[in-house]
């Protein structure tokens, strides 16, 4: 069996069907003796260019180990499913189980956002305390 990285884009109107589609595709691979090494749902993202007048799509990535027969059946499912607007299959030398660069970048972005928001709250809390003491000093005078 060979290792593959599969990315497919689902029409944004069918985003709620992604879970069922992924379940169907993983079942197809596992029934043929294959294995899912990594499954990542990247969610709805902006496309670089419009595909069939659609500007966003729901991205899903799978790293699998499967036979050529299972892969051909999976590609047929992609081809005849109108909800899948694009797919990409890349043959890999070995199984990739680590987190993808997309998810790492997303986590870094959320961590930076949290750090950026934290000091603002701390500054405003300190500023409120100093204003209270100033107003009490002014009241004494």
Swiss-Prot record:
Keyword DNA-binding: no
Gene3D superfamilies linked to this entry: 3.30.70.60
Claim: RNA-binding is one of the keywords in the record: yes
One Gene Ontology term from the biological process aspect of the record: translation
Record region (Disordered): 96-141
PROSITE patterns: RIBOSOMAL_S6
Amino acid composition bias (Basic and acidic residues), ranges on this chain: 103-124
A Pfam match: Ribosomal_S6
InterPro entries: Ribosomal_bS6, Ribosomal_bS6_CS, Ribosomal_bS6_sf, Ribosomal_S6_plastid/chlpt, Transl_elong_EF1B/ribsomal_bS6
Record's keyword terms, sorted: Ribonucleoprotein, Ribosomal protein, RNA-binding, rRNA-binding
Family: Belongs to the bacterial ribosomal protein bS6 family.
Primary role: Binds together with bS18 to 16S ribosomal RNA.
HAMAP family tied to this protein: Ribosomal_bS6 (MF_00360)
Protein name: Small ribosomal subunit protein bS6
Gene name in the database record: rpsF
């Amino acid at each position: 069996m060979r290792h593959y990285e599969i990315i497919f884009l689902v029409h944004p109107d069918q985003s709620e069907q992604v879970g069922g589609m992924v379940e169907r595709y993983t079942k197809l691979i596992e029934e043929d003796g294959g294995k899912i090494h990594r499954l990542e749902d990247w969610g709805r993202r902006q496309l670089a260019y419009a595909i069939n007048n659609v500007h966003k799509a729901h991205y899903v990535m799978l790293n699998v180990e499967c036979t050529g027969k299972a892969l051909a059946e999976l590609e047929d499912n992609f081809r005849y499913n109108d909800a899948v607007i694009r797919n990409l299959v890349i043959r890999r030398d070995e199984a990739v189980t680590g987190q993808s660069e997309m998810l790492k970048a997303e986590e870094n972005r959320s961590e930076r956002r949290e750090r950026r928001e934290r000091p603002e709250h701390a500054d405003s809390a300190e500023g409120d305390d100093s204003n209270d003491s100033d107003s009490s000093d002014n009241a004494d005078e």
